[in-house]
Amino acid sequence: RDSSTSRGLGDVYKRQGLGSANFGTVVQVGEYVALLLGYRRIELYGVDHTLLDGLCVDDANRLCRADRHYYDAGPRAPQPIYMKVPHVPYTMSVYLAEVAELFRGHEVLRDYAASLGARIVNRTRGSMIDAYERGAE
């Protein structure tokens, strides 16, 4: 993992806008930009990251997910989850590794915010992100 020296150097690059972590979502990039712009309190709404809900493996041994949204009328049938390149179904191990990296990005943002004296508050009910302090929605 990161040594304290590399984390410190990384923060110097981040403060100058010369580097960032491996962020996996536009939300994370938005948080980073807000911190660069000097915001000291960032509140998240609607960022649930329920990427593990509805996971299953079908009879063809493909990783699938029943992706649900608040506007759906009912449950959706699980669909295979495909990698972008190459366009093949994810394996469980690859998918979980990518999801873990996504959540690690939130920990990096939390630590970077703290180094600036800023706070990130997650106000999303049911969110799976555990890196930030919680607040009522």
Describe each PLM feature range.
Residues D2-Y13:
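Single conserved hydrophobic/aromatic residue that forms the stacking wall/gate
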Residues G19-G30, A34, Y39-V57, T91-L102, ...:
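Glycine-rich anion-binding loop/nest that anchors nucleotide
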Residues D48-A73:
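Short, surface-exposed, charged loop/turn segments at secondary-structure junctions
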Residues Y70-S127:
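Polyanion-binding loop/helix "lid" in catalytic or ligand-binding cores
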Residues L109-D111, E133-A136:
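Short, aromatic/basic amphipathic alpha-helical patches
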